[in-house]
């Protein structure tokens, strides 16, 4: 647990990117949850009344929602990449500083290429974990909370 706390200490200057990334995932999730409601409305009102103008209007609104979901998804990717790779750069910098403190007798036990490979591979794995794992960790609770909220909004007697 102490190792996790120590690693988390390097995220300091990237907290803003992590928060903005989480916000973008929540907004994207909201747009994705609104589109099925719009489709139901399109069918219940537009198709049932044969109102072509209403169908085109709802279709356009759904297209805008889909584009906004795409944009927020791309912004999430940008923020998550900046946070994870910036964090990884700080970890590598700390690792290299620690290796520089080794005595010559300790350095003789390791090849230079072995040290570099170990440090870069481990940090790359952690970067990819943060970059790809942050989305589902944020998206799951967002879907749950927004889904429950929308279900109560659609049917308050529920």
Question: Which functions belong to the PLM regions below?
Answer:
Residues 1-32, 47-62, 72, 76-80, ...:
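Membrane-integrated ABC transporters
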Residues 37, 41, 78, 82, ...:
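Transmembrane alpha-helix boundary and packing residues in multipass membrane permease domains
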Residues 91-92, 106-112:
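Transmembrane helix boundary and interhelical loop/hinge segments in multi-pass membrane proteins
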Residues 122:
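Short phosphate-coordinating micro-motif centered on Lys-Gly-acidic
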